[in-house]
Amino acid sequence: DNSYLIKLRENVRWSNGQRFTSEDVRFTIDRLKDSQTIYSANVQNVTGVDIVDDYTLKINLDKEIPFFEYNLTFPILSKDYYEGEDFSNTNKNSAPVGTGKFKITDAQSSYIILEKNSNWWNKEKEITLEKITVNLYSSIGELYNSFKIGNIDLIGTSNDNLQEYIGTIGYSSKEIKGREHTFLALNMSNYFLSKQEIRKAISYSIDRTNITDSVFNSKYYTSSFPLDYGNWLCQEQDSSSGYNLDQAKQVLVDNGWSYKNNYWQKTENYKTQKVALNLLVKASDSAKLSVAQNIKSQLENQGIRINIVQASDTQYSSAISSKNYDIAICSMYVSPSPNLDTFFGADNLSNYSNEEVNDIMNEVKNTTDENILKEKYKRLIEIYKSDVPYISLYNNKYTVAYNSALVGDITPNWYYLFYGIEGWYK
């Protein structure tokens, strides 16, 4: 479907008292298309917005975008507040109006103050927090020092060595699995990798925990699927394709492979083939080089020979684009959208094709039924682990540290660190 009909909540007002309407949404999309911001890509395929009424609009796309509704997660601008302004340079950006629980009442070079928004639409929601101060710092060192002496109540960081900077006392912390996903792409145009038993044996032979422990000192999470970061469609995980050396050997033996002279090999058409593969990694990424060496060691201990190809950034990009690799270590920030075209769509990284997967991918694009989506994604996960076109390795870790005196339900998630902030106090 190339169009979306959007219904807005009625009786919502901006913090300055003006009504929030469809015109504000269209104005925002137009500004995003005219500007270069982190949200511009969200609307790059929008060809136009038709206003149906004050609370209904139709968004038209130049092509079908699976799960386009997940692109509609950008802040909305008030047309009345911003119209006629140079959006990139206006002073109004320092204190924009909003429709949320809190509003900006003061903005300076070193801090921003937010206070309870009396115009917020949900009058039934109790908000105990009266005021939030956002402190701004010119360096991360200043930020950490300010947290240590108690000037800040909460910080969020992907720094793996946070304790070295803020110590271990006076605060609590919670860890969140991030969306930076590292995985192996197995090029199925390769003779060996075209065989499911080889791909399975490789997966069974890699101990992901060994990688996160030895390379990252346990500061990364092992992962088993691209959406395995807390996405609602990937909640149930099993270990069916986890580390299991006995299964690695058995799946090869069952398919006619034999282990001789430290190689897994097989004779077909009077020719003996010994399993040997190239592993592509970006030479400039020292951590990934260590991961590659770890994987090489694990696989060669099981008779699967690995040659590490250390490529320059340019060479790596070229190899990925042309699919000129056997196995590639890849990383990407997985979108909040459950769209898996990168992994299963046309021209995917593994040259993988599966008719059932194609059918599921087409079905999930055209339904909003949560039960159907859960059922279909459960099946996608099963196929991912059975066919092994990719091997998920690990995700980054995000840490939220907060003052021990801070009270309330502090439950940050991968999408929003300040979930439930309206009920915090100290």
Annotated model-derived regions:
Residues 5-7, 41-82:
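Surface-exposed binding/hinge segments that line
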Residues 9, 115-121, 176-201, 205, ...:
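A bilobed periplasmic-binding-protein/Venus flytrap-type ligand-binding module shared by bacterial periplasmic
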Residues 194-296, 379:
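Append "and occasionally in soluble cytosolic enzymes with long acidic Gly/Pro-rich linkers
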Residues 119-165, 305-307:
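Ligand-site clamp/hinge motif
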Residues 111, 205-236, 287-296, 320-426:
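Detector for C-terminal structural segments
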